[in-house]
Amino acid sequence: MKHLVIATRGSKLALWQAEHIKSLIETEHAGKVDVSLKIIKTKGDIILDVPLAKVGGKGLFVKEIEEALLDGSADLAVHSMKDVPMELPEGLFLGCIPEREEPSDTLLSVRYASLDALPHGARVGTSSLRRQSQLLALRPDLDIISLRGNVDTRLRKLMDGEFDAIVMATAGLKRLGLSAPHHEVLAPPRFLPAVGQGALGIEFREDRADLRDMLAFLDHRPTRIRVEAERGFLAGLEGGCQVPIAGHAVMTGDDDFRIEGLVADLKGERVIRRTLEGTGANARNRGLELASQVLADGAAEILDEVYASGAADRQ
């Protein structure tokens, strides 16, 4: 029997995702493959007292995991796609992108039923400049406060009354079966998600032809097209996942898609949104073209100001 090791972060959500892929592999190759998990702490797991955008550097949640792939102590890694840098280390690639969970964000609250129901000056917790910008664009009166930690920690702080509401990825909440007394899905086009949000990426070494064949069943072409278009948009902006950039692609046919991209300033006062259509074969290039459009429309100036403010580091 073949044995595979999955490298993963140790958070409850990361473990759920790794266990999910483990189960799919062992079911598909029943009696032929068994899988174990190797838990690895990343820089992003260790530095919890600084907003993510200020920690800086690429691959906050993946670098140490990729080192395990390169040194052979793990065979594959399961990542949240929104954490995966644009450029992978030499010798590694994203072999599979499984079917995507809902990419939206969700507003959670103990007392208030929706974003519109929040009182003037309500304290809203989020670790994301992208969410901050879009929240302030909709509700400039809100007090946005940095919130770090795993899913349980964030929910506990909400329940303890530190915040009137918090915003988290819908996919993580659904995967862990978590919620709050009140919740509202902040769905596109009203509120755009991070590039790759809700999707998983399976990374392994390029020289592992055995894994290419064994794991091919995990790859979901519509999800790959959507994610490649979104990542093309982010690459064209030379941005990371901690910057106020959002991208969301949807399939409009068997091979056709539409992508909407957004860049905003930190206060949500200037928001640039543009849309393009494309096909699977040119997904990444259409994302790059969309980036060129928003840069020409003023996004370059906005991003320069974000970096100059010190709120986020250039990737």
UniProtKB/Swiss-Prot annotation:
Signal peptide: none annotated. Binds 1 dipyrromethane group covalently. Its cofactor is dipyrromethane. It comes from the Bacteria. It catalyses: 4 porphobilinogen + H2O = hydroxymethylbilane + 4 NH4(+). Pathway: Porphyrin-containing compound metabolism; protoporphyrin-IX biosynthesis; coproporphyrinogen-III from 5-aminolevulinate: step 2/4. Its EC number is 2.5.1.61. The keyword Nucleotide-binding does not apply. GO terms for cellular component: cytoplasm. One of its GO terms (molecular function) is hydroxymethylbilane synthase activity. The modification S-(dipyrrolylmethanemethyl)cysteine is found at C241. One of its GO terms (biological process) is protoporphyrinogen IX biosynthetic process. The keyword Ribosomal protein does not apply. Monomer. Tetrapolymerization of the monopyrrole PBG into the hydroxymethylbilane pre-uroporphyrinogen in several discrete steps. Belongs to the HMBS family. NCBIfam families: hemC (TIGR00212). The porphobilinogen subunits are added to the dipyrromethane group. This is Porphobilinogen deaminase. It comes from Nitratidesulfovibrio vulgaris (strain DP4) (Desulfovibrio vulgaris).
